[in-house]
A protein has these predicted regions:
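Hydrophobic h-region of N-terminal signal peptides that target proteins for export
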Residues: 5-18
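Active-site metal-binding loops of divalent metal-dependent hydrolases
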Residues: 30-31, 146
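Short active-site segment of divalent metal-dependent hydrolases/proteases
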Residues: 32-34, 235
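Short N-terminal helix/helix-N-cap motif within the alpha/beta-hydrolase-1
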Residues: 36-37, 151
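Conserved SGNH/GDSL esterase-like catalytic core that processes O-acyl groups on lipids
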Residues: 42-156
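Alpha-helical cap/lid subdomain in secreted, periplasmic
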Residues: 21, 107-250
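Conserved beta-strand elements of the Class I
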Residues: 26-28, 140
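Active-site flanking residues adjacent to catalytic metal/cofactor-binding acidic residues
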Residues: 29-30, 130
Length: 250
């Protein structure tokens, strides 16, 4: 496991908020961070469901929200979960998975076998909806890039501004745009990007370079047990262990 802590953020390592109350945490993620009844907005697509739900994937043993990595993290740190805006299948870039059939015009591609336009569910689109009536959280944990890697999203070029819509269908420009937006909208918020194991090397390297450029942190995760391609209860606990260890500076 590798990690980086940037000098710019050394003053924000404290696990209490600036108001001396509990640390306020938000999650921006994909299917790995979903659970029915805990997403905001509630219409987000999910992967994890309670054991008594007809939609629960019996191949995976995560059956309660208490088993999720993010609920374990907030519980162990005595933190407040401000919001979890995670969306199953979502990508950082606008490009999604290849179409299985012809679909309505989404402004990018119509033909089967061509990538779908995932811009409405993208991390960029959802980044504008972070926080609650009190304001932005103290800490945002961003857990994405997995679907970009699995969907074969092109990495594109390193680009730090003047992005066109076409640019945002590639990973590097999209991640840079996401980081820029977060920096402008929530300048005082600490942001840590969590990086799944087993991703394409160019996705991992790009995440390192771009998050560092914008003064954000990243944590490379490892040893995540999975069932059905998604963290099992054991895998969720492994993620929580690594995140808590990192946030505590251990």
């Amino acid at each position: 496991m590798k990690r980086i802590l940037l000098p710019l953020l050394l003053a924000t390592v404290s696990l209490t908020s600036s108001a001396a109350g509990p640390l306020r945490i938000a999650i921006l993620g994909d299917s790995y961070s979903t659970f029915e009844g805990y997403m905001s907005p509630a219409i987000n697509e999910l992967w994890y469901y309670p054991a008594d739900s007809k939609r629960h994937n019996k191949a995976n043993d995560v059956v309660s929200v208490e088993q999720t990595w993010w609920m374990q993290v907030t519980g162990r740190l005595g933190a407040t979960l401000v919001q979890n805006n995670s969306y199953s299948g979502s990508t950082i870039a606008f490009q999604g998975y290849a179409r299985q059939k012809e679909a309505a015009n989404d402004g990018h591609s119509l033909r089967p076998g061509h990538p779908a336009d995932y811009s409405p569910r993208s991390f960029i689109a959802r980044a504008v909806n972070i926080g609650d009536s009190i304001g932005a959280p103290d800490l945002l944990l961003v857990f994405g890039g997995t679907n970009d890697s699995w969907a074969g999203t092109p990495v594109g070029d390193y680009q730090w501004g003047r992005w066109t819509r076409a640019d945002l269908f590639t990973y590097r420009p999209a991640l840079a745009r996401l980081c820029r937006d977060l920096r402008e909208m929530y300048p005082a918020m600490r942001v840590v990007f969590l990086i799944n194991e087993g991703l394409r090397p160019e996705i991992v390297e790009s995440t390192h370079v771009i998050t560092k450029y914008y003064g954000y942190e990243y944590l490379n995760l490892s040893d995540i047990d999975k069932q059905g391609g998604h963290p099992s209860h054991k895998g969720m606990t492994s993620i929580a262990d690594q995140v808590c260890k990192y946030l505590k500076g251990e």
